[in-house]
């Protein structure tokens, strides 16, 4: 009988294919996305259309803010009170479980609002403390996340246009759950072969979910499995939520392919598209018929009205009331478990996750399961469908089983959630009306009492209504639609739900132009419609499973007594496996260490770059030494080779150093690994030497204690090594005739007993304090106390004697200097090789308190080498040579002889070969004042401040004279107190004639008296209040740098404005993006700094457009823009950009962390082009953001590039390795490439970098092209001259049209050293000269190799010299020297080169009577020794010869000499002044310029200029050299500018 029924059904299904659709596609194919179903309202029912309300929205603000606590009950409290109850209550209508899940399937075909909206908004559900499921520990802070659904962005604007949610699927019964809601989705499901849907390895199953399908792949809450693996490709995005929905999806999948196969057999000439569309049309029609005419009546217990035809004016859109009503009513009928049975009515046992056996599938453990062990074959799916058809559903009431109430799949970090509470929140999100308003809107009788909602429930279980009423404060008008509709249900949906559902389905049918019963759409004929009406879900099941129809009841949505295969019993939670508990995921779990390492690595970029720069600098320095031949070892005697190796212990906190110990006749020599002498210990009798050996710790320590020396402590590797030295030492001591004692101590006691070098230094410091307290009458308390640790140390301090080395070190000289030897021999009266306290005191008294006669007698005795009471000319020459040693000056013997002869001749002793003391003292008669100031310069002893000030003035413009009065008073310039000094200590500032010293060196007569150096008026000006001084200093600072301040203010105002604009936008104006809700501080900081960085890195290019700057500085713009400060501005911008880059990176570190802990639903809103919310929730790990995204990877690379560029561009490394700076700074090309890529990805906002970058980049490229057109022209070198001190003078051709000004600089590249490495040098030629010249000092590897290359050629002619590339000229601030009536040029070190051109240019212009505004130039040359720049001396000599109008005043300062008036400096000063007076030239430089010893005190000099040039209101000061010097000049200018007098405008450049 069953077999006959199956054959009959097959005939019926096959008959419509042969009778009907015989032609290819001849009808209007229905779109997959639902558009154009209604030809007047095209969007009705389409995917993404609004939900259509039946009742006006109910929001807290009338627009979009949902109602919630405290106005409405807590959702969890409400679900516990109204929906909790026991499971196992059978349906009163005997509805089957298959009908319940078919309803879910229909619902998924009609509506989907689960997709979260953007920006992410949350209505989190607060869990009451102590909740047994979600808060068993009673923490009280558990919150179940609930994200609001996607809404129409055009809604939610006003109360008349409240927020409306959008439908993510089509709002038609068009099989979108089978075929998808878009054409692309459908294409991904199709096989494009035979009109079938694509299947996997098993034809009964579709292919697995894979791109481009974006199936919802939420994690399995029971097992934690994630990913798309094991999920099937369905038309419904959430078709894999549980095996029961999967089974229905598989049913329709197989039914479609079955229809396509039969059509293919009937019409073999049809193609894939024809077969697919015919099969789809028939499946949809069957689906519509079953849903509306079979399932809906079983659900509502009432049939819809008869179909009256298509109504184009009826809006079929899904209502939010229908969504909540149907979904929530289905949830009350879901049982805790689902049976499986076969065709012979055998109910199977199922395998659980833990491999246990149970009678049914537990619903709570089946959500989002992958590769379910009970559903691996088509027969398993059939068994599940048959089991659902035979199983009675739960009762249709208010009770929801725990599988849905407590263990529904959770979202975000929670694996479980409360489905009912979620639906309540969804209703509030939808703005659903109250229960009473909904009834009134649908025309239902009003309810006024809680008991009237459900009289049966009120009688049987009144506590539910009472608890619900209590939660709503007994206010029935506040009762929400969802709980009210459930509470009125009993066996069937209540009147409210029934009305809502029936209304929706009638509108869906009557408003659908493609409804299968609509004969006007041309889809089906009357006969085909009749056949479809006669097809039921039972027929579909029989056709797909190929089973005997008798195994199924006629209506599979009900099971009545007598139907086949009754269920064993109504399932309850008993006997079923327990639900897997709720868990909370930590998205950042396992990432903390790696994240920290990554951030640490990024922070180490500067350190790595610093280490690399240090290595490069060391290598360059080493190579440089090799080039200079300075890397060879110290030249030592042969006898030093082969000493004993040991480690010298220097103290408890000092590191040990490896040494070699050499025993030599009469001394012990300690050297380092390079054979440089570290220490020499003299062995002279009758010294008592103590040799102490350690007796523990391997017996490897040795202490050699020698009187009047600090101890020598040596450590050896082995005792045998120590023993060898001990034996040799004993022999050496015996040979020297010294007594020695030897004993052992523990190593700790040995080191405690040892006197270290540091302890000896403290002892000597106290020695000197008490020594000078005897001479200078210092209070003993201020002199310090002797150590009182032990009587032995007190005795050592009192008997302390200085060795020759300590004596030399105290004077700051070398022990082998002739001055030290002479002085030490004179002071060492007992000849024991040491100076005692009394011996040092005797000679110190003469220096500190002696008369000029006593001092000159002392000097006479020092240099009377043969002790005959006479100084010969040879001894006088040796004395003079000892003075000159300290300046490293090597005058020839002839020059020294000339000096001595001139001094003898000046004093009338030209006929004498030897001098008595009286003759010697008479020779020094003109320098009595210098001798009065002569002291012994000892480190740590300062000269009184007043004397120092007067002495500084003595070196400048004044010529001091001795005060005639026996006692005068001097007023300190910084105070109002007067200090009295004796005539021997003070030079009188009153009788002063400043101009004489300036004019005299030029041999010109002084014609007028110049103002005094310090006047009373000046003193009053200086003694004004500190507030006035500060105000005046600020005023002058503003006046000096007004252009700089203006430009910097404008630039940083723009930068700050850009930062604030972006920061404000993301703080207050980017709510629609939602990113500030996720990372507020991080995004504000990163985007604000990004805007500023984009502006800075773009416009920093303009500061390097040298050609443009050189051109613009000649225009009127130079009055407003300080173009000469372009390089400083470049550094300022770069430094600020680096700081902002660090802040930008810090902001993104915060962003990455927050993105790494934000769920995918949030990230998909923030980055829709990067992420798709597929329900997996887990975000990408931190390393994905850093290294697998374009902005992240380019950002990391940018940090590395910037770290390299910044470190190598620092002043220190640029000075040590210019090539490293040159090469690394060319990474700017990579920098801008990465910046463009980094900013063009548009991860957060649209690219904006090009807005700032385009214009500066074009200007910069144009400027570079101009330089390129110049720098590739080969320039011939006319002359190359190797000057002393490593200076190379290059003279080369002047290119045609090459115009420049004095003080400008160029860049050159030597073709022999590479055509890409350019180095900047200042032109030392004057603009009027026909050739260009440079003076290049060999200060680095490149300049050293340049010097080697331009060594004198073997042949003749300049063709032998390598050619140059030239780029320039470029301007600097020194060009403005001619704009001041009086200019001061201060050059230090290599910084003097810009002034060579200026001096020559000035003299030339004055010689040709050219009108020059500048009337006077003071040139101050500061150098360690004049030998460093002999070439500049030649230029100065040329200037002096051509300076006929006395325009230039030159002062040379040699800083290597001591600044204090000690004996040797005094004698050197006397000889220098004598040489200058006799020959009108300096002893050191050979120039008429005044040579000073020490550093220039700029402040007194500038004060004197105010007196010398009182009519000049503004003096220009131009300094170039080391930063320390330029800072001192700047400080002096600031101090002078505090006074309301002459204004000093300072311009500087550091080298």
From Swiss-Prot:
E.C. code: 1.11.1.-, 1.6.3.1
Gene Ontology MF: a single term: NAD(P)H oxidase H2O2-forming activity
Domain of life: Eukaryota
Membrane spanning residue stretches: 597-617, 1045-1065, 1081-1101, 1152-1172, 1189-1209, 1227-1247, 1249-1269
Domain Ferric oxidoreductase: 1087-1269
Modification after translation (UniProt): N-glycosylated.
Catalytic activity: NADH + O2 + H(+) = H2O2 + NAD(+); NADPH + O2 + H(+) = H2O2 + NADP(+)
Region of interest called Peroxidase-like, as start-end residue ranges on this chain: 26-593
Binding-site residues for Ca(2+) 1, renumbered to this chain: 828, 830, 832, 834, 839
Alphabetical UniProt keywords: Calcium, Cell membrane, FAD, Flavoprotein, Glycoprotein, Hydrogen peroxide, Membrane, Metal-binding, NADP, Oxidoreductase, Peroxidase, Repeat, Signal, Thyroid hormones biosynthesis, Transmembrane, Transmembrane helix
Regulation: Peroxidase activity is inhibited by aminobenzohydrazide. The NADPH oxidase activity is calcium-dependent.
Location(s) in or outside the cell: Apical cell membrane
Membrane topology, Extracellular segments: 22-596, 1066-1080, 1173-1188, 1248
Residues that bind Ca(2+) 2: 864, 866, 868, 875
Cytoplasmic side of membrane: 618-1044, 1102-1151, 1210-1226, 1270-1551
Signal peptide bounds: 1-21
Record-linked PROSITE patterns: EF_HAND_1, EF_HAND_2, FAD_FR, PEROXIDASE_3
Broadest EC class assigned to this enzyme: oxidoreductase
Any GO BP annotation: thyroid hormone generation
Topological relation to the membrane, as annotated: Multi-pass membrane protein
Function text: Generates hydrogen peroxide which is required for the activity of thyroid peroxidase/TPO and lactoperoxidase/LPO. Plays a role in thyroid hormones synthesis and lactoperoxidase-mediated antimicrobial defense at the surface of mucosa. May have its own peroxidase activity through its N-terminal peroxidase-like domain.
Family as reported in the entry's similarity comment: In the N-terminal section; belongs to the peroxidase family.
Oligomer and partners: Interacts with TPO and CYBA. Interacts with TXNDC11.
Protein name as catalogued: Dual oxidase 1
Species assigned in the record: Canis lupus familiaris
Lineage: Eukaryota, Metazoa, Chordata, Craniata, Vertebrata
């Amino acid at each position: 009988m069953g077999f006959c029924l199956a054959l009959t059904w097959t005939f019926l299904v096959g008959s419509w294919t042969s009778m009907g659709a015989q032609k290819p596609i001849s009808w209007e194919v229905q779109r997959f996305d639902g558009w154009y179903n209604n030809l007047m309202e095209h969007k009705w029912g389409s995917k993404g259309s609004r939900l259509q309300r039946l009742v006006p929205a109910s929001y807290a603000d009338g627009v979009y803010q949902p109602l919630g606590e405290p106005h409405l009950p807590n959702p969890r409290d409400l679900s516990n009170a109204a929906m909790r109850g026991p499971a196992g209550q059978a349906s009163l209508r005997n509805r089957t479980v298959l009908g319940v899940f078919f309803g879910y399937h229909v619902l998924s075909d009609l509506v989907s609002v689960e997709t979260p909206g953007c920006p992410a908004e949350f209505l989190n559900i607060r869990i009451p403390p102590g909740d047994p499921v979600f808060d068993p520990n009673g923490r009280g802070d558990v919150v179940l996340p609930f994200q609001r659904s996607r809404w129409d962005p055009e809604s939610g604007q006003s109360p008349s246009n409240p927020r409306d949610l959008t439908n993510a699927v089509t709002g038609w019964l068009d099989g979108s759950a089978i075929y998808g809601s878009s054409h692309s989705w459908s294409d991904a499901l199709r096989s494009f072969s035979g009109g079938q849907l694509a299947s996997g390895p098993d034809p009964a199953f579709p292919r697995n979910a894979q791109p481009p399908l974006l199936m919802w792949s939420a994690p399995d809450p029971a097992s934690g499995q994630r990913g798309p693996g094991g999920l099937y490709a369905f038309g419904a995005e959430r078709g894999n939520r549980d095996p029961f929905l999967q089974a229905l999806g598989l049913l329709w999948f197989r039914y479609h392919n079955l229809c396509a196969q039969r059509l293919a057999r009937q019409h073999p000439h049809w193609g894939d598209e024809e077969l697919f569309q015919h099969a789809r049309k028939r499946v949809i029609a069957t689906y519509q018929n079953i849903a509306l005419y079979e399932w809906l009546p079983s659900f509502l217990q009432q049939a819809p009205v008869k179909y009256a035809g298509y109504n184009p004016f009826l809006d079929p859109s899904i209502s939010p009331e229908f969504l909540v009503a149907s979904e929530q009513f289905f949830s009350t009928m879901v049982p805790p478990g689902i049976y499986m049975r076969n065709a012979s009515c055998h109910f199977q046992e199922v395998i659980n996750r833990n491999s246990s056996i149970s009678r049914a599938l537990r619903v709570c453990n089946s959500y989002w399961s992958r590769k379910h062990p009970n559903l691996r074959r088509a027969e398993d799916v059939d068994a599940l469908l048959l089991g659902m058809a035979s199983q009675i559903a739960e009762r249709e009431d208010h009770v929801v089983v725990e599988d849905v109430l407590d263990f529904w799949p959770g979202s975000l970090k929670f694996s479980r959630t409360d489905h009912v509470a979620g639906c309540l929140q969804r209703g509030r999100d939808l703005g659903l009306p109250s229960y009473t308003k909904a009834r009134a809107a649908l025309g239902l009788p009003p309810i006024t009492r809680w008991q009237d909602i459900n009289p049966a429930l009120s009688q049987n279980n009144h506590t539910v209504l009472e608890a619900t009423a209590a939660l709503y404060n007994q206010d029935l008008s506040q009762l929400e639609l969802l709980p009210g509709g459930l509470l009125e249900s009993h066996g069937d949906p209540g009147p409210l739900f029934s009305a809502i559902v029936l209304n929706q389905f009638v509108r869906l049918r009557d408003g659908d132009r493609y409804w299968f019963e609509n004969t006007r759409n041309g889809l089906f004929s009357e006969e085909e419609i009749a056949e479809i009406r006669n097809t039921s879900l039972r027929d579909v099941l029989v056709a797909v499973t190929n089973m005997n129809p008798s195994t199924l009841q006629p209506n599979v949505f009900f099971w009545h007594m007598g139907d086949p295969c009754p269920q064993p019993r109504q399932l309850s939670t008993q006997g079923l496996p327990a639900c897997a508990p709720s868990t909370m995921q930590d998205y950042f779990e396992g990432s903390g260490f790696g994240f920290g390492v990554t951030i640490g690595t990024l922070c180490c970029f500067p350190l790595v770059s610093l280490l690399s720069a240090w290595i490069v600098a060391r290598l360059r320095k080493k190579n440089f030494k090799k080039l200079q031949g300075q890397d060879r070892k110290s030249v030592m005697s042969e006898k030093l080779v082969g000493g004993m190796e040991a480690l010298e212990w220097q103290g408890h906190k000092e590191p040990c150093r490896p040494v070699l110990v050499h025993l030599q006749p009469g001394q012990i020599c300690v050297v380092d690994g390079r054979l440089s002498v570290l220490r020499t210990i003299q062995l002279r009798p009758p010294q008592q030497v103590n040799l102490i050996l350690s007796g523990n710790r391997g017996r490897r320590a040795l202490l050699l204690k020698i009187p009047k020396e600090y101890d020598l402590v040596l450590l050896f590797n082995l005792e045998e090594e120590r023993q060898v030295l001990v034996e040799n030492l004993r022999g050496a001591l015996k040979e020297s005739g010294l007594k020695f004692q030897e004993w052992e101590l523990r190593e700790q006691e040995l080191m405690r007993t040892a006197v270290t070098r540091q302890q000896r230094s403290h002892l000597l410091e106290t020695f000197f304090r008490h020594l000078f307290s005897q001479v200078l009458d210092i209070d003993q308390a201020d002199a310090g106390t002797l150590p009182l640790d032990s009587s032995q140390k007190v005795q050592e301090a009192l008997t302390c004697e200085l060795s020759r080395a300590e004596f030399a070190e105290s004077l700051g000289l070398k022990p082998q200097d002739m001055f030290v030897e002479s002085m030490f021999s004179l002071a060492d009266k007992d000849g024991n090789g040491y100076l005692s306290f009394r011996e040092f005191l005797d000679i110190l008294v003469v220096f500190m308190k002696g008369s000029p006669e006593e001092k000159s007698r002392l000097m006479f005795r020092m240099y009377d080498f043969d002790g005959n009471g006479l100084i010969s000319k040879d001894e006088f020459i040796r004395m003079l040579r000892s003075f000159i040693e300290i300046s490293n000056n090597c005058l020839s013997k002839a020059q020294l002889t000339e000096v001595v002869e001139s001094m003898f001749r000046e004093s009338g002793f030209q006929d004498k070969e030897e001098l008595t003391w009286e003759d010697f003292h008479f020779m020094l008669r003109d320098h009595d004042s210098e001798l009065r100031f002569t002291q012994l310069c000892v480190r740590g002893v300062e000269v009184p401040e007043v004397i120092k000030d007067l002495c500084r003035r003595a070196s400048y413009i004044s010529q001091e004279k001795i005060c005639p009065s026996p006692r005068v008073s001097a007023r300190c310039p910084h105070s109002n107190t007067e200090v009295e000094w004796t005539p021997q200590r003070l030079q009188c500032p009153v009788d002063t004639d400043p101009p004489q010293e300036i004019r005299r060196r030029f041999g010109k007569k002084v014609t007028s008296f110049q103002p005094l150096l310090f006047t009373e008026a000046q003193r009053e000006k200086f003694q004004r209040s500190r507030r006035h001084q500060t105000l005046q200093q600020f005023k002058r600072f503003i006046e000096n740098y007004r252009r700089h301040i203006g430009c910097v203010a404008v630039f940083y105002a723009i930068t700050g404005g850009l930062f604030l604009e972006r920061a404000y936008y993301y703080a207050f104006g980017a709510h629609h993006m939602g990113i500030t809700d996720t990372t507020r501080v991080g995004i504000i900081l990163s985007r604000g700094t990004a805007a500023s960085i984009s502006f800075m890195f773009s416009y920093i290019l303009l500061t390097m457009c040298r050609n443009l700057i050189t051109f613009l500085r000649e225009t009127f713009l130079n009055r407003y823009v300080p173009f000469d400060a372009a390089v400083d501005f470049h550094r300022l911008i770069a430094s600020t950009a680096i700081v902002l880059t660090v802040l930008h990176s810090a902001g993104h570190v915060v962003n990455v962390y927050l993105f790494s802990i934000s769920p995918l639903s949030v990230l998909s809103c923030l980055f829709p082009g990067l992420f798709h919310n597929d329900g997996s929730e887990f975000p990408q790990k931190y390393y994905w953001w850093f290294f697998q995204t374009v902005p992240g990877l380019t950002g990391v690379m940018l940090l590395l590039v910037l770290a390299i560029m910044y470190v190598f561009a620092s002043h220190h490394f640029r000075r040590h390795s210019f090539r490293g700076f040159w090469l690394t700074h060319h990474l700017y090309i990579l920098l801008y490439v990465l910046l463009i890529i980094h900013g063009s990805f548009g991860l957060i906002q649209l690219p904006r970098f090009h807005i700032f970058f385009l214009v500066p980049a074009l200007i910069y490229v144009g400027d570079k092209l101009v330089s390129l057109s110049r720098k590739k022209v080969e320039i011939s070198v006319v002359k190359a001259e190797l000057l002393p001190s490593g200076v190379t003078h290059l003279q080369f051709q002047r290119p045609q049209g090459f115009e420049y000004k004095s003080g400008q600089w160029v860049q050159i590249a030597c073709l022999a050293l590479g055509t890409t490495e350019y180095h900047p040098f200042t032109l030392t030629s004057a603009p009027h000269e026909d050739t260009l010249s440079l003076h290049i000092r060999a200060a680095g590897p490149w300049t050293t190799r340049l010097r080697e290359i331009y060594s004198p050629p073997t042949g003749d002619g300049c063709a032998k010299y390598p050619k140059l590339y030239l780029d320039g000229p470029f301007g600097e601030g020194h060009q403005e020297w001619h704009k001041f009536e009086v200019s001061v040029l201060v050059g230090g070190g290599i910084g003097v080169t810009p002034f060579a051109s200026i001096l020559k240019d000035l003299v030339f212009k004055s010689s040709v009577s050219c009108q020059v505004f500048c009337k006077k130039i003071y040139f101050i040359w500061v150098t360690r020794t004049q030998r460093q720049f002999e070439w500049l001396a030649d230029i100065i000599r040329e200037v002096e010869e051509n300076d006929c109008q006395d325009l230039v005043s030159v002062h040379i300062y040699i800083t290597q000499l001591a600044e204090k008036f000690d004996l040797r400096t005094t004698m050197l000063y006397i000889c220098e002044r004598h040489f200058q007076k006799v020959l009108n030239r300096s002893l050191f430089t050979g120039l008429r310029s005044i040579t000073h010893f020490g550093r220039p005190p700029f402040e007194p000099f500038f004060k004197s200029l105010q007196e010398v040039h009182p009519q000049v209101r503004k003096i220009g000061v131009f300094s170039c050299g080391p930063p320390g010097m330029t800072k001192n000049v700047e400080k002096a200018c600031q101090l002078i500018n505090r006074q309301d007098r002459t204004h000093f405008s300072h311009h500087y450049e550091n080298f």
